[in-house]
């Protein structure tokens, strides 16, 4: 276990000025971060089921990449008992466990140096539809992770969660208007101003804007639940053939955008359709295990935003969520076709989904540089 309490004074320049850019997820990684789940008003049984699932995810990642886990001091003993021994536990306060959204975006330069972008965070909407209050500890997470690695920090003047962007490492950024243009994130900024800031801090040149994310996604449609890059020039899209499903018009509109766009290199996109599980719903028993608090209520019968797109690429391994016995094998086979050189590892992940996200949402990769 390590303890981090280091002030990382932000740089006064921007990554693009300094020759830094966000690499693609398939670039080599030196570590993956996770955070301990404990909120009783979001996780049933005060997180016990989720903690066991997080341990399985950490184990699946750890076979390919070192895993760090931020844990509040009060839960260190519990985490040590539950987590695999190879996981490095780091004492760290947080309001919840979404490392993708509260952690830093690590950028690299051509010499292999790493720095981190620390985005603004308001718990997916602040006082206008946000998912809990307060979020002050979450705002400190990125800085603490960067301090653990000794990386210099850029402080970006933009409310942004890591799950709301995907990049191909070659100048293209994919995102959703439902989230990034939502009035509860950066209402004072225009679309053009948001793009300018992403150019500054990710060093990207071309944007692919999908309108909406997955139906009932409480993050306001994060792109990482809806679509992602598989490699340069190739994307994966969450899909259903059921025209009566509320997801269908969302996926159909996204497909039309992807079919009629090019990336930063001018390439037409090859599109892989990944079938949705379910539909899946929260059960009465699952709902009863969540206590009342400032978190969003978990209501029995509510549709869950399940998606196989919410996987992590980490050092030639794909760690993806097992969500539905009827479609899990189909998803695994499709992922193996898309990633023939990767090992495809499924982890039962319904407990993460019940909390509002999945494997990509609870992880944040640290690129290796060179």
UniProtKB/Swiss-Prot annotation:
Catalytic activity of the protein: agmatine + H2O = N-carbamoylputrescine + NH4(+)
Active site: 361 (amidino-cysteine intermediate)
Catalytic class of the enzyme: hydrolase
MF terms (GO), sorted A to Z: agmatine deiminase activity; protein-arginine deiminase activity
Gene Ontology biological process: putrescine biosynthetic process
Keywords: Hydrolase
InterPro entries: Agmatine_deiminase (IPR017754), Peptidyl-Arg-deiminase_porph (IPR007466)
Gene3D superfamilies documented for this protein: L-arginine/glycine Amidinotransferase, Chain A
Taxonomic superkingdom: Bacteria
EC number: 3.5.3.12
Family assignment from sequence similarity: Belongs to the agmatine deiminase family.
Protein's name in the database: Putative agmatine deiminase
């Amino acid at each position: 276990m390590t303890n981090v309490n280091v002030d990382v004074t932000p740089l006064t320049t921007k990554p693009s000025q300094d020759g830094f850019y966000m690499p693609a997820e398939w670039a080599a990684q030196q570590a993956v971060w996770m955070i301990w789940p404990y909120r009783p008003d979001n996780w049933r049984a005060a997180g016990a089921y989720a903690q066991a699932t997080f341990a399985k995810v950490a184990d699946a990642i750890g076979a390919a990449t070192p895993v760090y886990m931020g844990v509040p001091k009060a839960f260190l003993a519990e985490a040590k008992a539950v987590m695999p021994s190879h996981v490095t536990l780091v004492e760290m306060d947080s309001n919840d466990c979404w490392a993708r959204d509260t952690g830093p975006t690590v950028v690299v330069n051509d010499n292999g140096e790493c720095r981190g972008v620390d985005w603004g965070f308001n718990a997916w909407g602040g006082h206008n539809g946000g998912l809990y209050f307060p979020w002050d500890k979450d705002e400190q997470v990125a800085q603490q992770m960067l301090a653990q690695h000794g990386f210099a920090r850029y402080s970006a003047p933009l409310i942004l969660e890591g799950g709301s962007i995907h990049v191909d490492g070659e100048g293209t950024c994919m995102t959703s208007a439902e989230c990034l243009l939502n009035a509860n994130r950066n209402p004072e900024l225009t679309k053009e101003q948001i793009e300018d800031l992403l150019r500054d801090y990710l060093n990207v040149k071309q944007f692919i804007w999908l309108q909406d994310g997955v139906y009932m996604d409480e993050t306001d449609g994060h792109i990482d639940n809806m679509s992602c890059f598989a490699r340069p020039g190739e994307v994966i899209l969450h899909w259903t053939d059921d025209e009566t499903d509320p997801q269908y018009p969302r996926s159909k509109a996204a497909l039309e955008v992807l079919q009629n766009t090019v990336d930063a290199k001018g390439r037409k996109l090859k599109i892989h359709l990944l079938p949705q599980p379910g539909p899946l719903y929260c059960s009465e028993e699952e709902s009863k295990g969540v206590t009342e608090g400032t978190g969003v209520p978990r209501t029995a019968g509510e549709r869950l935003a399940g998606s196989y797109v919410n996987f992590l690429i980490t050092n030639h391994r794909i760690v993806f969520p097992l969500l539905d016995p009827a479609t899990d094998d189909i998803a695994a086979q499709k992922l193996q076709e898309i990633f023939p050189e990767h090992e495809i590892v499924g982890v039962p992940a319904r407990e993460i989904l019940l909390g509002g996200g999945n494997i990509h949402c609870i992880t944040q990769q640290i690129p290796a540089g060179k």
